[in-house]
Amino acid sequence: MERDLISVESRDLNEAELGYRTEPFVKMQPAFKDYLWGGTKLKEHYGKHCDYDSIAESWELSAHEAGQSIVASGRYKGRLFADNLSKIGRENCGWKCQSIERFPILVKLIDAKENLSVQVHPDDDYALSRENEYGKNEMWYVLEHEEGAGIKCGF
């Protein structure tokens, strides 16, 4: 459905209503994580630049308190992604975002040079009560892998 798309143009808004000019697409500066298992492929193959020697994760689109993306182009360049959402309003982020306080999706690139630890992710109720964050439902799209690599889930 078209209304599921994230766009600042999801309804007929104009500058007079909003008090500012909308831009349909903006570039984001990711937040980087340098966990022990990270590698150098995000730098070497994907052009990610940061001060870390290795990058485990590049949080491409994040309103998470532990690492927010920064708007890297357009009128709101330099603003935190979450602050930008506050300015354009949740109503412009799709109808499913109306009942939440924060943007619920975290898009990241991962370079797992070493094995990761076992990951156990709580549901929303548990995570909100313990860490004031949403739970982690995940979807993975593997861009490339080494011979013999694998993912185990659901055990």
Indicate residue ranges for each PLM-predicted region.
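Transition-metal
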Residues: 1-154
